[in-house]
Amino acid sequence: MPAADPQRLLELINGCWTTQALCATVELGIADTLADQPMDAATLARCAGTDSQATARLLRALVSLGVCECHGTVYGLTANGRLLAAGPGPSLRGWATLAGRGLWAPWHGLADSVRTGLGHHARDGHDRFEALDGDAEAASAFQQAMSELTALIAGPVAAIIGGRLVGTGHIVDVGGGHGGLLAAVLASRPGWHGTVFDRPHARAGAERLLREEGLADRVAIISGNFFDGVPAGDVLLLKSVLHDWGDNCSALLLRRCADALSPRGMLLAVERLMPEAPSDLPAHRALCRSDLNMLIGPGGCERTEPEFRALFATAGLSIVAVTPSAAGFVVIEARP
């Protein structure tokens, strides 16, 4: 057994401080301001309307995190820091805000979730996603964060999905949010059209994204609850949906999808695979944290490949291929 490393453990314990520092950087507009022009702490404080000394202390912390760089007294963003600023290209600013605000309180209940096996939504009798329909601000923050995470993996995952599509057809993105992955798939498959199916709160964002991508005439947007049924299609796509839900709810959703598939249709689920024996690797740590995030929220989980195969079988679906992508996700192909 390796010797104890108290400093490493302290870094893990204090990880919550890092989350809040990054969230504050977005919330105060510091990343946006520095993206326009590097500047000293006093000038930045005037632009952001913050205290000069406190701003300097936050900037010092951001340098230590590799988010900012300092030359003399002038601070600027590193490449990672630019992911916290608004603008075109990859971004994680929405995720930083969601992690620091929307997910903060639920994580306080992790011990209770481990005691009971229930997420805080189940304990409170609330449906997390249904609640978003009545909270425009929370819904916008959630969908922005989800869109950012999807954009990071859309390229390699869409290439795999596109390779499964031949000729013409109809693909339904179930729980598709703003439709970013569907848009990436359809960009290289002009013979196909699609539908984004999600809760009502996602509709406006989907309309905007599809219009910007020039796909408004090829993609319909339908609002609803996928546990009640899903639109019919030749291909049904589920990206990071099954991990939200426990086995009973996931099996019901898969049965709804199986019922909606056209003859000889297929279901494609984009998920990450939990390793049989996780270790102290960055990818494993990220996946295990996500697994706990699902536990404390809607009650879902990350699954191993055998667990996915058993789950799909309960819905009358057979997994015929599991294709890894360069983005760390796999594309699970299943058929009735």
Across the structure, where does each feature detected by a protein language model lie?
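Alpha-helical subdomain
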Residues: 1-70, 163-166, 170-336
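Conserved Class I S-adenosyl-L-methionine-dependent methyltransferase catalytic core
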Residues: 6-27, 32-33, 38, 47, ...
